[in-house]
Regions:
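N-terminal accessory targeting/assembly segments
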Residues: 1-107
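Conserved G1/Walker A P-loop phosphate-binding module
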Residues: 10, 140-276
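A charged, well-structured terminal subsegment
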Residues: 124, 128-142
Length: 276
């Protein structure tokens, strides 16, 4: 199930997404299908007010709970950033897994990353996201333990241990990515010595950038009718019809409301666009 919340007008200036609700709905359904989910129900939900504890009002939560049961929904995707408490409360109310926009895009990126750099970037974004949800995960485990008696929930000390492990891993990945940044900087410095301009193909995800790149270069870069098919930049030297030579770069596609954790994680990749 895909839900697209439309915030009250007074909240829209602060909202991450100001796009038309139907456009958001179509895009989010496409994102869900990108990880092979069978979308059985999709709807735009207008909110009279934003509930801090669950985003939706109690009446709408009950209505969706019924729909989840009728359609036998295994996961509900909410096209909005959810706080850990909101996510937990919705999972309890609907008795199913809930994923917000950030979690959905992270899942797609995790499946698409091919190179070591790409996997590091995705892992960094995922760990940053996961770190803020340690308490939510803990309360979820505690709830399961109380209901079934076979799953021991960790105490606060376990949460702190998990947080330390995640922080250590984040620091290690950042150090590794700094090496990537330095390497890319050296490569760019080398390219500046070559009298060929760098041209980056920039656009929305699944707009056809990789297909165009292949047509111009014959590179055989993976191109498919799916979002985020390309996560790692590829460069090729080509000769234009005018005879001029350029270095053409295929890049990761953009999408509305790209989570800030992903923007930060893909710094090295995005720098190729900035420096084109």
């Amino acid at each position: 199930m895909v839900l697209v919340p439309v915030l009250p007008e007074r909240n829209r200036a602060k909202a991450a997404d100001l796009h038309a609700p139907d456009d958001r709905l179509g895009e989010t359904v496409g994102l869900a299908q990108a990880i092979d989910l069978d979308v059985r129900d999709a709807q735009v939900v207008s909110l009279a007010t934003v509930r801090p504890g669950a985003l939706f009002g109690s009446g709408k939560i009950e209505e969706i709970e019924t729909s989840v049961a009728v359609h036998e929904i295994g996961i509900v995707i909410v096209d909005h950033a959810l706080t850990p408490i909101q996510q937990r409360n919705l999972e309890v109310a609907w008795k199913t897994k809930v994923l917000d926009r950030t979690g959905l895009i992270l899942e797609i990126f995790g499946r698409r990353a091919q190179t070591r750099e790409g996997r590091l970037q995705v892992e960094l974004a995922h760990l940053t996201y996961q770190r803020g949800r340690l308490v939510r995960s803990w309360t979820h485990l505690e709830r399961q333990r109380g209901g079934f008696g076979f799953l021991g929930g960790p105490g606060e000390s376990q949460i702190e241990t998990d947080r330390r492990i995640i922080n250590d891993r984040i620091d290690k990945i950042k150090r590794e990515l700094e090496t990537v940044v330095r390497t890319r900087s050296l490569h760019r410095a080398g390219r500046r010595k070559v009298p060929y301009p760098v041209v980056a193909l920039v656009g929305y995800t699944n707009a056809g950038k990789s297909t165009l790149f292949n047509a111009l270069t014959g590179a055989g870069v993976h191109a498919e009718d799916q979002v985020f098919a390309t996560l790692d930049p590829t460069m090729r030297e080509i000769r234009l019809s005018s005879g001029r030579r350029i270095i053409l770069s295929d890049t990761v596609g953009f999408i509305s409301n790209l989570p800030t954790t992903l923007v930060a994680a893909f710094r090295a990749t995005l720098e190729e666009v900035i420096n084109a």
